[in-house]
Amino acid sequence: MAPSWMSFERERIKSNMIIGFRAFIDFERPSQELIEAYRSLPSANIGDCCYKMNCMFDGIHSFNDIPLCGPAFTVKVPAGDNLVAQLALDYAKPGDIIVIDGAGFTNRALVGGMMVTYAKEKQLGGFVVNGAIRDVDDIKNSPIPVYGITQTPLGPYRSGPGEMNVPVCCGGQVVMPGDIIVGDHDGIVVIPQKDADELLQAVRKNLDHEQTEMKKMKSGQYTLQDHQKEFLEKFLKNGGVFK
């Protein structure tokens, strides 16, 4: 059962609905079929098909080496305060990725072992934190994927304000509610929901082409120099240097 203070804050955020302290609970999510299609695709290939424009910076990394894929449930909080991030766990749906914009502040943790344990009970899809986490040992033993910048023993404030399901900035990328978040050992890529169907076909084609080239390289039929030459000629042609 949620503590009494949380019930009070839940009602307060629902009644305020002013900039800085508001919650938008309902938003469109991509189909489960589309999410599952992306789950098996490497973040690097997805990033390549976005011209490397949709990848979060390398400071945000996995703390328990578990890949993630799901719709973004965005949270925006002041530096070092996780009141609204905690409240978000009650509103998020199974499979949602809690994307927390903590402005990159790392002196206080925004997510810890208790929140991750609760997320497991709620069957959430994971956390991506533009800030710090703590209780690393608990997180390493959890099946819930957790990505963040660093760790600290210092806990957060719980004073507010904050916002749910507004545009946020995380790892240098704008994330909208419902965008598909894919994370693995290489990092995290953000897929705008409106582009997800079209991008999927491009990523599959890119991956097939890459795997074919890898097979040729392993058999000695194709060298890295061949690949570089082919890429360079294509680049120069697209740039108008070659006709």
Each model region followed by its residue ranges:
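Feature captures the catalytic cores and cofactor-binding loops of soluble hydro-lyases/lyases
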Residues: P3-P177, I191-K243
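Beta-strand-loop-alpha-helix segment that lines the small-molecule cofactor/substrate pocket
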Residues: D184
